[in-house]
Structures are given as structure tokens and as C-alpha cells.
Amino acid sequence: TEPNEKGLEFYDKVFDCCKKHGIEPLVTISHYELPYALVEKYNGWASRELIEFYMNYCKAIFERYKDKVKYWLTFNEINCGTMPMGAILETGTIRGFEGPTDKVPDNKQERFQALHHQFVASAEAVRYAHDHYPQFKMGCMICFITSYALTCDPADEIANQKAMQISNWFCSDMHVRGEYPSYMKRYFAENNITIRQEPEDAAILKAGTVDFYTFSYYMSNCITTHKDADDVGGNIIAGKKNPYLKASDWGWQIDPIGLRYTLNEIYDRYRIPLMVVENGLGAYDKKDADGKIHDSYRIDYLRAHIEQM
């Protein structure tokens, strides 16, 4: 199938406009928009065949925009695939599912197999870009939800360590280090998950590591083994209430210092360039008498986070 020329022309105009105004584009290749036809026919990324479809897409846009785009991200918030809701958001492993979204069945074997195919696809795209377009810089994108142990109970510390490993570190370890970490091998064994791999996959993953790391940061959570802790709101990730933090109207805990902590942790782990690509505040915005929204609270939120950078 040939790419949609009108769609390609649209992004030509977007990138030309960016250049006109001195804006450097950063393109996410796949951002929660897997074509539903691929869900219906292949059960999304559960099928290895999607790697070829993804590469055809990458080759088309790389060649088309090679003189307009330098920075690329292979998948948006790929680590959401480690969570049950990731079957809808990230992996598309929902063939036959009609909703509601909070009732999506949790098939860990399917989700983590789909993630493996995405890791291989990402590595293939990075390797292809490096070989054919040496001016390109290829990155990953992680939904980073920093968490703390709620108490100094060692059981809480271990629970938080495991949560951070699965939710935050696993996918970026794959992208940056190019191999499965030991903690995931244990997780797979404990959850009866068997990742089917082709003989060449290990070499592909190792050869296709990213040049830079990007992430979204909105909030932090607390993790505990204690049953009496208060829950706190979130998006697809919920945790326990941190008594030292305020929360947004939506229950997301506001933690600017957590961003500083997160930047330190990520850079010490990987030693590659970092970029915060999502950050902001959701609120019940109301128009004042002049018909405008005077959201000084949002300015305060952004200022506090920028100061930590």
C-alpha cells in the first residue's frame, strides 16, 4: 500500500512552518494510534508481522522528511504496555474487545510479547536510521511515574523497587542497554510469561540502542505493603497518598522536587542526553468576568518544575 500523499503533504507544511518560526521538530513515530485494522486482523503487536508494517512506515517518513526532521522517538510512553490499560493504549492487543475500557482483560503473556515486538521494531528503526541517515538522532519516550516507599519498612522499600523496575526502568533498559534485565527474567518466571524470540533478536536489540532519552513527568506516587494507606488519584497509574504533597483537582500529586530526583536517577543510570517532553497541570479551569482563564496556579506549577531542572 502506498502512503497517503495528502497526509505526507500536511506534515511537510507543519515542518516548514516550524522551520519558519525557528522551531526544531521532535517527531514521535507511533503515538497511541495503531490502525484498528491491524488490531482486528493481527491482534495488534501480539503479531510479529507488525514489525514489517512499522518499518515500512518508518522508511517512508524517514525518506520524506530527512531534510526537515532530525530528532525522532520510536514509541510514545512505551512502558504503558507493562500495565493492563496498555493493551488499549500501547500494544493494541484487544481484538474482539468492545469495552468498557476499565474492563479490558489483563493478558500479561500477550502484552509482554507485544512489547518484545515493539522493542525489536524500535531497534530496527534506530539501526536503519543510523545506517541511512547519520544526521538523525533516535530516542525513546517513557511515562515516568516516580514512586517512593511510603514508610521505612523494608517490605515497602522492596515493593517500591519492584514497582520502579517494572513500570519505569524495564522499557528504557531495553531501549538504552539493548537487553533484558535480570529482574524481568525473574518477573517472567514468576508470572508464567514466555517471550518468544527469533535467534537474531538479541543482536538486533543490542545494535539498535537509542541516542537520547525522553520522558513525561506529571506526578509521583507512594508504594506500600500496608493496607491502611489512603489511595490517591492518577491516570492509568494510581498509588498511595504522600502526606507531604498537595494534589491537583484530578488527584495527581504535585511534586517538583521529584522531577529533580528523577533526572538524577535517569542520568546516573544511562549517561545519555535527557529531555522532558511532557509536563503540565490539569485543573477545573473557569473563565473570569473578562471571559479569560487566569490560571496563575498553572504558571506556579510550571515554574516550580522548571526551577528543578
Functional labels for PLM-detected ranges:
Residues T1-Y11:
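Active-site-adjacent substrate/metal-binding segments within catalytic domains
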Residues E9-Q308:
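Active-site region of glycoside hydrolase catalytic domains
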